[in-house]
């Protein structure tokens, strides 16, 4: 396949024309931020094109295995192709199906860039609507899956709209998951945060607060964003 489409990173390429949700800043932030250095088993819920799984494979130990699940057949197929073309084909497994039905040995780290609009909203593209509609994976479904599939010392890393992050924090204790790190994502200096990178863990924790500003007031990428994404972006 030629590389006249999709998104080329330093060590891999992602085609996403058959995926409802395209490569975007949310996924790139999650893949660059999630604490994967010492993990051996990772689960990516709603992998889409496989972007986050590929980023985590680049950042993790050589013996780390990453399982990635997506409900959409076309996305799962394209994710498999992206993985097959990458340096980590033997370490990433792509599976199609609902996470509510997924069974596996517990994981050290679970990551997700989950759907985030409710029943009152819609999208014209049915596949995109499925990928972004919380009717197929609501907050409690996500937390229940994480509770069931996480080791006793495992962590969950999510990228979420601010309102959804606050909702998750309000109910996560019901699933023995508590805030470890809450990093507000601000698109441009001086604006309010509209996304959150959220890390959850077992047991009560002191939740570390922080922020990442993507663009300075003048529009340039911030030093922090460059530091996070430099291993991936071709021109960083």
From Swiss-Prot:
According to its UniProt entry, the protein's GO biological process terms are:
methylation; tRNA processing
Q: EC number(s) on record? A: 2.1.1.223
Q: Is Protease one of the keywords UniProt gives this record? A: no
Please name the source species. Aeromonas salmonicida (strain A449)
- What compartments host this protein? Cytoplasm
Q: Which reaction does it catalyse?
A: adenosine(37) in tRNA1(Val) + S-adenosyl-L-methionine = N(6)-methyladenosine(37) in tRNA1(Val) + S-adenosyl-L-homocysteine + H(+)
Any single GO CC term annotated in Swiss-Prot or TrEMBL for this entry? cytoplasm
Q: What is this protein called?
A: tRNA1(Val) (adenine(37)-N6)-methyltransferase
- Give GO MF terms, alphabetically: nucleic acid binding; tRNA (adenine-N6)-methyltransferase activity
Q: Which domain of life is it from?
A: Bacteria
């Amino acid at each position: 396949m030629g590389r006249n489409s999709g998104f080329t990173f330093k060590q891999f390429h992602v085609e996403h024309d058959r995926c409802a949700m395209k490569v975007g800043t949310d996924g790139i932030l999650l893949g660059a931020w999630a604490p994967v250095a010492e993990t051996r088993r990772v689960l990516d819920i709603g992998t889409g094109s496989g972007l986050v799984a590929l980023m985590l494979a680049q950042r993790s130990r050589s013996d780390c295995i990453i399982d990635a699940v997506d409900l959409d057949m076309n996305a799962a197929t394209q994710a498999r192709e992206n993985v097959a073309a990458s340096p980590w084909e033997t370490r990433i497994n792509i599976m199609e199906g609902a996470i509510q039905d997924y069974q596996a040995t517990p994981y050290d780290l679970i990551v997700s860039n989950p759907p985030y609009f409710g029943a009152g909203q819609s999208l014209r593209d049915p596949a995109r609507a499925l990928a972004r509609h919380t009717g197929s994976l609501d907050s409690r479904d996500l937390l229940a899956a994480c509770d069931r599939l996480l080791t006793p010392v495992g962590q969950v890393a999510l990228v979420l709209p601010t309102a959804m992050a606050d909702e998750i924090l309000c109910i996560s204790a019901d699933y023995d998951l508590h805030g470890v790190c809450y990093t507000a994502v601000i698109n441009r200096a001086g604006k309010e945060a509209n996304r959150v990178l959220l890390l959850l863990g077992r047991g009560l924790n002191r939740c570390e607060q922080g922020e990442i500003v993507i663009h300075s007031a003048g529009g340039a990428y911030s030093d922090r964003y460059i530091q996070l994404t430099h291993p991936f972006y071709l021109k960083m």
